[in-house]
Amino acid sequence: MTVIVTGAAGFIGANIVKALNERGESRIIAVDNLTRADKFRNLVDCEIDDYLDKTEFVERFTRGDFGKVRAVFHEGACSDTMETDGRYMMDNNFRYSRAVLDACLAQGAQFLYASSAAIYGGSTRFVEEREVEAPLNVYGYSKFLFDQVIRRVLPSAKSQIAGFRYFNVYGPRETHKGRMASVAFHNFNQFRAEGKVKLFGEYNGYAPGEQTRDFVSVEDVAKVNLFFFDHPEKSGIFNLGTGRAQPFNDIASTVVNTLRALDNLPPLTLAQQVEQGLIEYVAFPDALRGKYQCFTQADQTKLRGAGYDAPFLTVQEGVDRYVRWLSGQV
């Protein structure tokens, strides 16, 4: 049967396509918007059956043009948290997602979709409960509102609906994202260009570089998606993070040491990297004060309760792999 991936040329979508290929799945319809044409590179080493622009996909899917569809991985969205055009954001992320959901429900196809930890906004608790959800931007609101639709639909749904609140994802195939790419990507490029990595200094009681995030490898994101693909009886909204907050210092230090290893140089401690000027702390910008999350950490209770028991890569493991991959692309 056919599998459809929206946002297939994007960061997470392309990694899901590749992961499906590695399992022998090639009857894949890739859906995307290639106005940013450079995204095509993410699919060059992937096998797909067909490609459709997002503007024609929903109508054709609703009409039944693709025969029996097993599942839709709905990864397509505007993920720019700085986007201020609310009308565009709601049409692209909310209305379009509702149309894809309706078509999946009508045809009995599994619906696995990208939600976001941005739904939690400034919360200090990250559990899939309405009372801790308070998005701070229209991107987060578009994801939040769609999750509310899912909560209403789930009790009567006859086919799988699984949403994943992605935390800070990093890894291969994100180059096209530019300023919205991960901190690991930017640290890598900054170190190659300047010989050092710059991080924010002290802020809100956190020591320099010690602000933390739940950084999750796209490898693990793809694995979780495929676990639910294999278990169509499991539905719900799930946090998708490691459950382990790590500081930005860990990202920067791993980037530096991996690049040193590739140059046959010994690893250095964080203190040594700072002392040698390989990591530099800059004053926290006034523009971000009061708008910056110093801590995120996924509560994995629901995900583990659904049966996903595989370990997640640490920053040290995942960023090391990613830097080696990036170095091979240069």
From Swiss-Prot:
Disulfide bonds: none annotated. One of its GO terms (biological process) is carbohydrate metabolic process. The active site is at 139 (proton acceptor), 177 (proton acceptor). InterPro entries: Epimerase_deHydtase (IPR001509), Heptose_epim (IPR011912), NAD(P)-bd_dom_sf (IPR036291). It catalyses: ADP-D-glycero-beta-D-manno-heptose = ADP-L-glycero-beta-D-manno-heptose. Substrate binds at residues 168, 179, 186, 200-203, 213, 292. It holds the Pfam family Epimerase. Its EC number is 5.1.3.20. Keywords: Carbohydrate metabolism, Isomerase, NADP. Its cofactor is NADP(+). NADP(+) binds at residues 11-12, 32-33, 39, 54, 75-79, 92, 143, 169, 177. GO terms for molecular function: ADP-glyceromanno-heptose 6-epimerase activity; NADP binding. It comes from the Bacteria. Binds 1 NADP(+) per subunit. Pathway: Nucleotide-sugar biosynthesis; ADP-L-glycero-beta-D-manno-heptose biosynthesis; ADP-L-glycero-beta-D-manno-heptose from D-glycero-beta-D-manno-heptose 7-phosphate: step 4/4. Contains a large N-terminal NADP-binding domain, and a smaller C-terminal substrate-binding domain. Belongs to the NAD(P)-dependent epimerase/dehydratase family. HldD subfamily. Catalyzes the interconversion between ADP-D-glycero-beta-D-manno-heptose and ADP-L-glycero-beta-D-manno-heptose via an epimerization at carbon 6 of the heptose. Homopentamer. This is ADP-L-glycero-D-manno-heptose-6-epimerase. It comes from Burkholderia ambifaria (strain MC40-6). The lineage of its organism: Bacteria, Pseudomonadati, Pseudomonadota, Betaproteobacteria, Burkholderiales.
